[in-house]
Amino acid sequence: MQKKYVVALDQGTTSSRAIVFDHDANIVSVSQREFTQLYPNPGWVEHDPMEIWASQSSVLIESLARAGIHSDEVAAIGITNQRETTIIWEKATGKPVYNAIVWQCRRSSEICEQLKAQGLEDYVRENTGLLLDPYFSGTKIKWILDNVPDARAKAKRGELLFGTVDTWLLWKLTEGKVHVTDPTNAARTLLFNIHSLSWDTTLLEALDIPAAMLPEVRPSCSVYGTTRIAGEGSEIPLAGIAGDQQAALFGQLCVEPGMAKNTYGTGCFLLMNTGNKAVRSSHGLLTTVAVGAQGEVNYALEGSVFMGGATIQWLRDELGLIRDASDTEYFASKVADTNGVYLVPAFVGLGAPYWDPNARGALFGLTRGANRNHIIRAALESIAYQSKDLLDAMIKDSGERLKSLKVDGGAVANDFLMQFQADITDVEVLRPSVCETTALGAAFLAGLAVGFWTSVTELEYKACIDKHFKPNIDASQRERLYVGWQDAVVRTRS
């Protein structure tokens, strides 16, 4: 049969999805299944690894069945995944020794403090590009080895394997034949030296983690093994892996220095490609690994906005100012500006570049003339201002000129927000026709690895832009608006 399709497995924090793409990068079929979130203690978050596998394997089968596609028509399968989430299982049986500890889980805070006390904070920053934080996998591994009976002894005997979610899925899809990850996922473990592109022995020793547990690191655009769907049909190559944010960066074809993307979700995730330079940030951004045009390792700066779409949820659920998130564009467009109102949504503190956990949300500039429309508009503008804060930090750190800003995520449907983002950053904002850029990135990597597509140049003809948002305000107005935002931020921190 002719190979007509590539499938992306998109394993997220709350659901597993499979998306089928054709040769023109159009979505042919989507299947999704949510799975259980486990909260055994305050600040702890877990998933059942077997439920992750069951949900992911079922949507793979379902996505093909829905479109009437035979598995022999599939050229390759790519994987993208929630990063940092940690799974340890028995090599002989494939049985997890503990639930997956999710990236959000804070249980290993004390281990991080111990490493700081040992003077490892700067070493971690320099060699992994990360902060010493429970967010990342390394301290989660140590917690499991320290707290699950016999786990450390088994690990030292070579009986246990570690993997992030990509590695777990690859292991299951190949029936235990392949124990592999890619550099984008390895770079989120706190154990991977992003300069030598190898596991860091100093950090493995500090955390007492046996190297034999760790997966082999292979390129993101590579064939790792094969699988059969439901045990039927021919063997399908498993051929591309990238963590979710790096997959989105590649799906947006941000493969050259100075190219950046912003994913607008509950928060916002911004990544800027810095090419072959691993730039150490002086603004609290993370240095991470990305994928280049030939599938080679590139580097990127990464930063996140805590409150993006969550700010709009607050307008809806706590204030009752809107019924649906889509209402915000209508109300914001009813007024010419915010009438001097600024909302700083520091509900859980401020992230990069401020890193102030004690800041709290506030509305500034309220007068008797301020109304609901002004507050709603200020909420939308706050998302763009926070994104500009990060983009400005990336530009200063990297020395790169921002060429354009590619965007994806739910909020990109809001034309007002996208136009204001272009206005306040003074760069063109590009919204793609296919907004499933995370899955598209995994599909692109898989397709390139098997020759389904030949080059990034070919992909540029597939990844169409739905709308260009060009800056539409002058420099003096831009400066006045942003100075007002910066003043408001200062006051939330005082």
From Swiss-Prot:
EC main group: transferase
InterPro entries xref list: ATPase_NBD (IPR043129), Carb_kinase_FGGY (IPR000577), Carb_kinase_FGGY_CS (IPR018483), FGGY_C (IPR018485), FGGY_N (IPR018484), Glycerol_kin (IPR005999)
Keywords per UniProt: ATP-binding, Glycerol metabolism, Kinase, Nucleotide-binding, Transferase
Protein family membership: Belongs to the FGGY kinase family.
Amino acids binding sn-glycerol 3-phosphate: T13, R83, E84, Y135, D244
Binding site for ATP: T13, T14, S15, T266, G309, Q313, G410
EC annotation from Swiss-Prot or TrEMBL: 2.7.1.30
Chain residues that bind ADP: T13, R17, T266, G309, G410, N414
Activity regulation comment: Inhibited by fructose 1,6-bisphosphate (FBP).
Gene3D superfamilies for this protein: 3.30.420.40
Record-linked PANTHER family: GLYCEROL KINASE, SUGAR KINASE
One cellular component (GO) term of this entry: cytosol
HAMAP family: Glycerol_kin
PROSITE patterns: FGGY_KINASES_1, FGGY_KINASES_2
Function: Key enzyme in the regulation of glycerol uptake and metabolism. Catalyzes the phosphorylation of glycerol to yield sn-glycerol 3-phosphate.
Annotated positions binding glycerol: R83, E84, Y135, D244, Q245
Pathway terms, separated by semicolons: Polyol metabolism; glycerol degradation via glycerol kinase pathway; sn-glycerol 3-phosphate from glycerol: step 1/1
Catalytic reactions of this protein: glycerol + ATP = sn-glycerol 3-phosphate + ADP + H(+)
Single Gene Ontology BP annotation: glycerol-3-phosphate metabolic process
Superkingdom classification of source: Bacteria
Keyword Flavoprotein included in the entry's annotation: no
GO MF term set: ATP binding; glycerol kinase activity
Protein's UniProt name: Glycerol kinase
